[in-house]
Each structure stands twice: as structure tokens, then as C-alpha cells.
């Protein structure tokens, strides 16, 4: 029976590339993001192994409903990839727009928490894996960066969840990439990491032998 992974932020970039990669590896993919059109197009591209689940990752109710539907549709859940996230238009505690700050914190912090809260009950049944998109920015101090601070949270949460989940045979991995060439940036970054690099890291964490707990994968561009 094919395994199933729930992916937030699945419509573009790292999420979409991970979905394609997982499907090629024989996984079912539950695709969660706000863009219904992009999700539908990706699900059509992947075929029967994909299920489009539109919703807002910063809303717990949306994620809980999506996880429940995915588990019912595919017969369970083996992994969840909390990938949804965003940056700020103008960085800085004083300079940044307050609504922009709130929206980013809701998605980058609460969105990750809600993926864990929604998915853990299903993952306990399969001794599954929770994967989080962290960042190289969450491993060092960056002057005035609130985005970086949200990623510090992700890294701390990942470590805490790894300890909690090991009690019932589950695993938690944080993927910490440097700059990735995705729609996150207005201009292309051809000399940086490709979304495929991150997708490959996610799959390595998901498909590692159960005896191995991969806590963190740190990726940086070679050039």
C-alpha cells in the first residue's frame, strides 16, 4: 500500500517540487495551499496519487479538515511536510508594516504548529514523520530580521517535537536550506539552491530506515 504525505504550501516552489518527487517515488500526495487553481493544475499533472485540498495554513480548522479528508481518501497518513511560509515586504520591527508582520508570524509560526497539531493524531497510527521547512536564517542571527526569528522558532519546535515523537516511534526533521530559487523571491536566483535539492532532502528524511532519526538537514549552495 502506498504511503501518504500531507504537504502545506504545495502549489509552488519547494512544496510543488516535493509533491512531484514524492509521487514519482510512489507516494500519495495531499496538496494543501490557498491557490485553488494552482493546486488543481498540480493535482491534474500528478494524477490519481494527488488530492487537492485548498485552505489557509494559518487556520487550524482548515488544516484539521484537510488532514482528515486526506486520511480518509488515502486510508491513512504517513508523513506531513509543514512547508508553507512567507517573508515580509519591508523588514524590521519598527519599519515593517504591522499587518504584514502579523500575517507572516501567523503563517510561519502558527501555520507550522497547526500542521503538527492536525497531523500528529494520524501520524501516531503509522509511526510517521513530521518534516518542517526551516532555514539557514534560523541558525544564525540576522540584524533586525523578524523572518529569521520565525525560523528560529521552527528549529526549536522541530527539536522539541523530535523528542516528543520518539516516544511513540515517530520522527521529526527540519530542513534548513540557504537561498532557494523559488517564487518566494521576485527575481530568479539561478546560482542558488533549486527546489529539487530541498525535495530530495525531504524524501531522504521520509524514506530513511526507521532505526535512523534524521533531526536536521542543512543545505547550502556550493557556488
What are the roles of these predicted feature ranges?
Residues 11-12:
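Conserved glycine-rich cofactor-binding loop
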Residues 25-42:
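Conserved glycine-rich Rossmann-like NAD(P)H-binding loop of the short-chain dehydrogenase/reductase
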Residues 54-65, 98:
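The beta1-alpha1 cofactor-binding region of Rossmann-like NAD(H)/NADP(H)-dependent oxidoreductases
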Residues 91-93, 97-103:
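Substrate-binding pocket helix/loop in short-chain dehydrogenase/reductase
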Residues 116, 150-151:
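Active-site helix of classical SDR
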Residues 135:
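Residue(s) in the substrate-gating loop at a strand-loop-helix junction
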Residues 170, 174-175, 189-223:
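C-terminal helical subdomain
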Amino acid at each position: 500500500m502506498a504511503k501518504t504525505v500531507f504537504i502545506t504550501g504545495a502549489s509552488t516552489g519547494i512544496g510543488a517540487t516535493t509533491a512531484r518527487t514524492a509521487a514519482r517515488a510512489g507516494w500519495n500526495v495531499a496538496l494543501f495551499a490557498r491557490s485553488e487553481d494552482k493546486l488543481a493544475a498540480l493535482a491534474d499533472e500528478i494524477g490519481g496519487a494527488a488530492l487537492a485540498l485548498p485552505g489557509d495554513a494559518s487556520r487550524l480548522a482548515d488544516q484539521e479538515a484537510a488532514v482528515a479528508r486526506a486520511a480518509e481518501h488515502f486510508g491513512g497518513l504517513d508523513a506531513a511536510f509543514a512547508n508553507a511560509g512567507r517573508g515580509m515586504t519591508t523588514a524590521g520591527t519598527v519599519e515593517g508594516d504591522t499587518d504584514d508582520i502579523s500575517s507572516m508570524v501567523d503563517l510561519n509560526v502558527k501555520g507550522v504548529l497547526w500542521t503538527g497539531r492536525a497531523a500528529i493524531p494520524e501520524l501516531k497510527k503509522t509511526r510517521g514523520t513530521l518534516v518542517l521547512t526551516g532555514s539557514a536564517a534560523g541558525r544564525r542571527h540576522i540584524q533586525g530580521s523578524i523572518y529569521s526569528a520565525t525560523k528560529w522558532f521552527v528549529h526549536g519546535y522541530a527539536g522539541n517535537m523530535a523528542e516528543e515523537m520518539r516516544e511513540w516511534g515517530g520522527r521529526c526533521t527540519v530542513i534548513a536550506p540557504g537561498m532557494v530559487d523559488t517564487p518566494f523571491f521576485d527575481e530568479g536566483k539561478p546560482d542558488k539552491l533549486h527546489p529539487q535539492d530541498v525535495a530530495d532532502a525531504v524524501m531522504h528524511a521520509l524514506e530513511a530506515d526507521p532505526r535512523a532519526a534524521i533531526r536536521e538537514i542543512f543545505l547550502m549552495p556550493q557556488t
